[in-house]
Design a protein with these regions (language model features):
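Negatively charged
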Residues: 1-8, 20, 24-172
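Short acidic, low-complexity intrinsically disordered linear motifs used
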Residues: 12, 16-20
Length: 172
């Protein structure tokens, strides 16, 4: 038999076979936006440190940067499952000496479903303007000043569920 014949044979693909016990439901493993289920960062602090290093090493223009070699490149592909605190994550990401922007990358695939606090996350990150509408922010309670000073940010957030929010002050 050829490989094509084997792959089209239903008995070689258990998922195509009828269930032996149709009353038993099979629950698939949790799926996140980024496709990861195992946390990459054991603590919020380690995650924040890695982000700061990624920015300071200018990894957005240097795929060979050290932190990119450690956690992968680009930053938008990092597994953020389990992170609960993103306060001040990209705050002030501008080089005030040269006025060069240090961060404006796509992080739309990050799993933020466990995040509770996004306070000041993009505070004075003046060039950040990436789509975030598909983020699951339903667990976030603090959005205070999240985009305050992020003068370029102009993306829709109409799909966000902010029903858990206790602070939305100065969000923009």
């Amino acid at each position: 038999r050829t490989a094509i014949q084997e792959s089209s044979d239903p008995s070689s693909n258990p998922s195509s076979l009828p269930s032996i016990n149709p009353s038993v439901a099979v629950t698939p493993a949790p799926v996140t936006l980024s496709g990861c289920t195992n946390p990459m960062f054991p603590t919020n602090e380690e995650f924040k440190k890695a982000v700061k290093e990624y920015i300071s090493q200018e990894c957005s223009t240097n795929s060979g940067c050290a932190i990119g070699q450690t956690y992968g490149y680009p930053i938008g592909k990092w597994c953020t499952t389990g992170i609960t605190d993103m306060r001040f994550l990209f705050a002030g990401t501008e080089n005030f000496m040269s006025r060069d922007v240090l961060f404006d990358e796509d992080i739309s695939e990050w799993d933020v479903s466990s995040v509770l606090n996004m306070e000041f996350m993009f505070y004075y990150a003046p060039s950040f303007n990436q789509p975030l509408n598909n983020w699951d922010v339903s667990s976030v309670s603090n959005f205070g000043a999240m985009f305050n000073g992020a003068s370029s940010f102009n993306q829709p957030l109409n799909d966000w569920d902010v029903s858990s929010a206790t602070s939305l002050g100065s969000m923009f």
